[in-house]
A protein has these predicted regions:
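Gly/Ala-rich phosphate-binding loop of Rossmann-like dinucleotide-binding domains
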Residues: 21, 25, 161
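Glycine-rich FAD pyrophosphate-binding loop
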Residues: 25-45
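Dinucleotide-binding Rossmann-like beta1-alpha1 core, especially the glycine-rich loop
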Residues: 48-128
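A short, glycine/Asx- and small/polar-enriched loop/turn
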Residues: 98, 129-137, 179-186
């Protein structure tokens, strides 16, 4: 049965929306997640699946990436379903002297901020990734903390646990409008009915 009210309506059921629904439901909120298509069928199904810090800029960008690592480790321990999170390290391949100069500056700033990243020589790069074209490898930046996940499995795992925590998950309704009165959201209008908040 389609809900008529909720404390929180989460619009979008990809990795971000499913994460929001899971953490709010776990905190005891009455949550409804609305996804107009299939579970994780939009951006979450088309991303590179990296849990990645190597290319992040110093400051808030790298701090958010580091927080993402913490959340992935937490979710790996909490969620029943394996979402294939692997922390196997990451490489940013350097192909010439110009790229090397750029990467060295990036590495220096990252090292100053205390994040693990190092410059490795072509032999070490090819040891880690032997299928690269040897003649094009000048070196690489290597981050031992980077990894990847299966975003589709992550969405499914989050949905499963959010539902166990009491969240309502609805796939295929479309949110058409947001009702606002006196500066507050009062509801989400969908093609299946309005959910009051």
């Amino acid at each position: 049965m389609f809900p008529q009210e909720a404390e929180v309506v989460v619009i979008g059921g990809g990795v971000v929306g499913s994460s929001v629904a899971y953490f709010l439901a776990r905190a005891g909120k009455k949550v409804v997640l609305i996804e107009k298509g299939c579970k994780g069928g939009e951006a979450s199904s088309a991303n590179a699946a990296f849990v990645w810090s190597i290319t992040r800029k110093p400051g808030i960008d790298i701090r958010l990436a580091m927080h993402s690592f913490d959340i992935h480790r937490q979710l790996k321990a909490e969620l029943e379903m394996d979402f294939e999170y692997v922390r196997g390290g990451g490489l940013m391949i350097i192909e010439d002297e110009t790229q090397l100069t750029f990467v060295e500056a990036h590495l220096q700033k990252r090292a100053e901020d205390g994040y693990p990243i190092e410059l490795i020589d072509p032999d070490k790069v090819l040891e880690l990734e032997p299928h690269l074209a040897k003649e094009r490898v000048f070196g690489a930046a290597y981050s031992p903390i980077d990894g990847f996940t299966n975003p589709m499995f992550l969405v499914l795992a989050l949905n499963l646990e959010a539902k166990k925590q009491g969240a309502g998950l609805f796939h295929h309704p479309e949110v058409l409008d947001i009702e606002v009165a006196d500066g507050q959201v009062k509801g989400a209008v969908t093609d299946k009915g309005t959910i009051k908040t």
